[in-house]
Protein backbone atom coordinates (compact mmCIF):
# COMPACT_ATOMS: atom_id res chain seq x y z
CA UNK A 1 0.00 0.00 0.00
CA UNK A 2 1.63 3.24 -1.13
CA UNK A 3 -0.04 6.22 0.49
CA UNK A 4 1.04 9.28 2.41
CA UNK A 5 -0.28 8.03 5.74
CA UNK A 6 -1.67 10.44 8.31
CA UNK A 7 -0.30 8.19 11.05
CA UNK A 8 2.94 6.47 9.96
CA UNK A 9 2.88 3.92 12.80
CA UNK A 10 0.20 2.61 15.13
CA UNK A 11 2.62 3.26 17.99
CA UNK A 12 2.34 6.98 17.18
CA UNK A 13 -1.32 6.93 18.20
CA UNK A 14 -2.95 7.40 21.58
CA UNK A 15 -4.67 4.15 22.59
CA UNK A 16 -6.51 2.86 25.65
CA UNK A 17 -8.43 -0.42 25.44
CA UNK A 18 -12.25 -0.07 25.57
CA UNK A 19 -12.17 3.70 25.02
CA UNK A 20 -12.46 3.63 21.22
CA UNK A 21 -14.46 6.87 21.09
CA UNK A 22 -11.61 8.73 22.81
CA UNK A 23 -8.93 6.97 20.77
CA UNK A 24 -10.59 8.23 17.59
CA UNK A 25 -11.03 11.74 19.05
CA UNK A 26 -7.27 11.73 19.66
CA UNK A 27 -6.64 10.70 16.04
CA UNK A 28 -8.77 13.64 14.87
CA UNK A 29 -6.86 15.93 17.21
CA UNK A 30 -3.55 14.65 15.85
CA UNK A 31 -4.60 15.38 12.26
CA UNK A 32 -5.72 18.89 13.21
CA UNK A 33 -2.34 19.49 14.82
CA UNK A 34 -0.03 17.87 12.26
CA UNK A 35 -1.99 17.75 8.96
CA UNK A 36 -4.76 20.38 9.23
CA UNK A 37 -5.25 20.50 5.46
CA UNK A 38 -6.50 16.88 5.62
CA UNK A 39 -9.01 17.32 8.45
CA UNK A 40 -11.95 18.00 6.12
CA UNK A 41 -11.36 14.58 4.53
CA UNK A 42 -11.49 12.72 7.86
CA UNK A 43 -14.41 11.19 9.76
CA UNK A 44 -15.21 9.47 13.03
CA UNK A 45 -17.51 6.49 12.46
CA UNK A 46 -19.68 4.93 15.17
CA UNK A 47 -21.18 1.50 14.49
CA UNK A 48 -24.09 0.24 16.59
CA UNK A 49 -27.82 -0.52 16.41
CA UNK A 50 -30.97 -0.16 18.50
CA UNK A 51 -30.17 -3.18 20.65
CA UNK A 52 -26.46 -2.33 20.86
CA UNK A 53 -25.43 -5.80 19.68
CA UNK A 54 -23.17 -5.54 16.63
CA UNK A 55 -20.93 -8.41 15.46
CA UNK A 56 -17.50 -7.45 14.12
CA UNK A 57 -14.85 -9.77 12.77
CA UNK A 58 -11.05 -9.42 12.80
CA UNK A 59 -11.01 -7.73 16.19
CA UNK A 60 -8.21 -8.08 18.76
CA UNK A 61 -10.83 -8.86 21.42
CA UNK A 62 -12.50 -11.46 19.18
CA UNK A 63 -12.54 -15.22 19.60
CA UNK A 64 -11.92 -18.13 17.28
CA UNK A 65 -10.25 -18.20 13.90
CA UNK A 66 -12.47 -15.37 12.64
CA UNK A 67 -11.76 -13.18 15.69
CA UNK A 68 -15.43 -12.24 16.01
CA UNK A 69 -16.78 -10.17 18.88
CA UNK A 70 -20.16 -8.59 19.63
CA UNK A 71 -19.78 -4.99 20.75
CA UNK A 72 -22.43 -2.61 22.04
CA UNK A 73 -20.73 -0.05 19.79
CA UNK A 74 -17.40 0.55 18.12
CA UNK A 75 -15.66 3.62 16.69
CA UNK A 76 -13.07 3.89 13.94
CA UNK A 77 -11.46 6.65 11.86
CA UNK A 78 -11.53 7.06 8.09
CA UNK A 79 -9.52 9.26 5.75
CA UNK A 80 -11.10 9.79 2.34
CA UNK A 81 -8.70 11.88 0.23
CA UNK A 82 -9.63 10.50 -3.21
CA UNK A 83 -12.24 8.24 -4.79
CA UNK A 84 -11.46 4.63 -3.87
CA UNK A 85 -8.48 5.70 -1.78
CA UNK A 86 -10.46 5.73 1.45
CA UNK A 87 -8.45 4.31 4.35
CA UNK A 88 -9.72 2.95 7.66
CA UNK A 89 -7.68 3.40 10.83
CA UNK A 90 -9.00 1.02 13.49
CA UNK A 91 -6.86 0.64 16.57
CA UNK A 92 -8.71 -2.53 17.61
CA UNK A 93 -8.54 -4.52 14.38
CA UNK A 94 -6.14 -7.34 13.54
CA UNK A 95 -6.07 -6.07 9.95
CA UNK A 96 -3.22 -3.80 8.84
CA UNK A 97 -3.16 -0.21 10.10
CA UNK A 98 -4.45 1.37 7.92
CA UNK A 99 -6.58 -0.84 5.66
CA UNK A 100 -8.32 0.16 2.44
CA UNK A 101 -12.03 0.74 3.00
CA UNK A 102 -13.33 -2.12 0.84
CA UNK A 103 -11.07 -4.72 2.47
CA UNK A 104 -11.88 -3.45 5.95
CA UNK A 105 -15.65 -3.49 5.44
CA UNK A 106 -15.59 -6.89 3.71
CA UNK A 107 -13.59 -8.56 6.47
CA UNK A 108 -14.93 -6.68 9.50
CA UNK A 109 -18.66 -6.45 8.73
CA UNK A 110 -19.08 -9.08 6.01
CA UNK A 111 -22.80 -8.89 5.16
CA UNK A 112 -26.06 -8.25 6.98
CA UNK A 113 -27.79 -10.89 4.83
CA UNK A 114 -26.66 -13.78 7.03
CA UNK A 115 -27.48 -11.97 10.28
CA UNK A 116 -30.66 -11.69 12.29
CA UNK A 117 -32.23 -8.21 11.92
CA UNK A 118 -31.37 -7.32 15.51
CA UNK A 119 -27.69 -7.70 14.63
CA UNK A 120 -27.71 -5.48 11.53
CA UNK A 121 -25.10 -2.75 11.72
CA UNK A 122 -25.72 0.98 11.32
CA UNK A 123 -23.13 3.72 10.98
CA UNK A 124 -23.06 7.29 12.24
CA UNK A 125 -20.49 9.22 10.20
CA UNK A 126 -19.29 12.48 11.74
CA UNK A 127 -16.85 14.94 10.11
CA UNK A 128 -13.67 15.08 12.17
CA UNK A 129 -13.92 18.80 12.85
CA UNK A 130 -17.48 18.35 14.16
CA UNK A 131 -16.40 15.44 16.33
CA UNK A 132 -13.62 17.47 17.90
CA UNK A 133 -16.07 20.22 18.86
CA UNK A 134 -19.19 18.27 19.86
CA UNK A 135 -17.97 15.04 21.47
CA UNK A 136 -18.04 15.06 25.26
CA UNK A 137 -17.70 12.20 27.74
CA UNK A 138 -17.22 12.13 31.50
CA UNK A 139 -16.67 8.35 31.22
CA UNK A 140 -19.67 7.49 33.39
CA UNK A 141 -20.47 4.52 31.12
CA UNK A 142 -17.23 2.88 32.24
CA UNK A 143 -18.05 2.95 35.97
CA UNK A 144 -19.75 0.25 38.01
CA UNK A 145 -22.57 1.19 40.43
CA UNK A 146 -20.01 1.36 43.25
CA UNK A 147 -17.95 3.90 41.27
CA UNK A 148 -15.07 1.57 40.39
CA UNK A 149 -13.81 1.38 36.82
CA UNK A 150 -14.88 -1.44 34.49
CA UNK A 151 -11.66 -0.78 32.56
CA UNK A 152 -8.89 1.65 33.60
CA UNK A 153 -9.45 5.07 31.99
CA UNK A 154 -6.92 7.06 29.96
CA UNK A 155 -4.38 9.02 31.99
CA UNK A 156 -5.42 12.34 30.43
CA UNK A 157 -8.52 14.25 31.67
CA UNK A 158 -11.96 13.43 30.22
CA UNK A 159 -12.78 15.05 26.88
CA UNK A 160 -15.48 17.61 27.67
CA UNK A 161 -17.08 20.11 25.29
CA UNK A 162 -18.21 23.56 26.37
CA UNK A 163 -21.90 22.73 25.93
CA UNK A 164 -22.40 19.20 27.25
CA UNK A 165 -20.87 17.16 30.06
CA UNK A 166 -21.72 13.76 28.56
CA UNK A 167 -23.24 13.20 25.11
CA UNK A 168 -21.80 9.81 24.14
CA UNK A 169 -25.32 8.38 23.81
CA UNK A 170 -26.14 10.86 21.04
CA UNK A 171 -23.28 9.44 18.97
CA UNK A 172 -24.14 5.79 19.63
CA UNK A 173 -27.84 6.37 18.81
CA UNK A 174 -28.62 5.26 15.27
CA UNK A 175 -31.92 7.12 14.86
CA UNK A 176 -31.89 9.39 11.81
CA UNK A 177 -32.39 13.04 12.70
CA UNK A 178 -30.82 12.69 16.14
CA UNK A 179 -27.22 13.43 16.97
CA UNK A 180 -24.44 14.80 14.76
CA UNK A 181 -23.43 13.56 11.33
CA UNK A 182 -25.35 11.14 9.12
CA UNK A 183 -26.67 7.63 9.79
CA UNK A 184 -26.36 4.86 7.18
CA UNK A 185 -27.15 1.18 6.82
CA UNK A 186 -24.21 -1.05 5.89
CA UNK A 187 -25.05 -0.92 2.17
CA UNK A 188 -25.52 2.87 2.25
CA UNK A 189 -22.24 3.28 4.11
CA UNK A 190 -20.38 1.31 1.43
CA UNK A 191 -22.06 3.26 -1.38
CA UNK A 192 -20.93 6.54 0.15
CA UNK A 193 -17.26 5.63 0.48
CA UNK A 194 -16.57 3.05 -2.23
CA UNK A 195 -17.26 2.75 -5.95
CA UNK A 196 -16.42 -0.54 -7.65
CA UNK A 197 -14.08 -0.37 -10.67
CA UNK A 198 -16.97 -1.61 -12.86
CA UNK A 199 -19.23 1.26 -11.76
CA UNK A 200 -16.43 3.78 -12.24
CA UNK A 201 -15.82 2.49 -15.79
CA UNK A 202 -19.53 2.75 -16.59
CA UNK A 203 -19.66 6.32 -15.29
CA UNK A 204 -16.65 7.32 -17.38
CA UNK A 205 -18.13 6.11 -20.67
Curated annotation (Swiss-Prot):
<comment type="subunit">
    <text>Monomer.</text>
</comment>
<dbReference type="InterPro" id="IPR037132">
    <property type="entry name" value="N_Gln_amidohydro_ab_roll_sf"/>
</dbReference>
<dbReference type="InterPro" id="IPR023128">
    <property type="entry name" value="Prot_N_Gln_amidohydro_ab_roll"/>
</dbReference>
<feature type="active site">
    <location>
        <position position="74"/>
    </location>
</feature>
<keyword id="KW-0378">Hydrolase</keyword>
<comment type="similarity">
    <text>Belongs to the NTAQ1 family.</text>
</comment>
<dbReference type="Pfam" id="PF09764">
    <property type="entry name" value="Nt_Gln_amidase"/>
</dbReference>
<comment type="function">
    <text>Mediates the side-chain deamidation of N-terminal glutamine residues to glutamate, an important step in N-end rule pathway of protein degradation. Conversion of the resulting N-terminal glutamine to glutamate renders the protein susceptible to arginylation, polyubiquitination and degradation as specified by the N-end rule. Does not act on substrates with internal or C-terminal glutamine and does not act on non-glutamine residues in any position.</text>
</comment>
<dbReference type="InterPro" id="IPR039733">
    <property type="entry name" value="NTAQ1"/>
</dbReference>
<dbReference type="GO" id="GO:0005829">
    <property type="term" value="C:cytosol"/>
</dbReference>
<dbReference type="GO" id="GO:0005634">
    <property type="term" value="C:nucleus"/>
</dbReference>
<protein>
    <recommendedName>
        <fullName>Protein N-terminal glutamine amidohydrolase</fullName>
        <ecNumber>3.5.1.122</ecNumber>
    </recommendedName>
</protein>
<feature type="active site">
    <location>
        <position position="90"/>
    </location>
</feature>
<dbReference type="GO" id="GO:0070773">
    <property type="term" value="F:protein-N-terminal glutamine amidohydrolase activity"/>
</dbReference>
<feature type="active site">
    <location>
        <position position="20"/>
    </location>
</feature>
<dbReference type="GO" id="GO:0008418">
    <property type="term" value="F:protein-N-terminal asparagine amidohydrolase activity"/>
</dbReference>
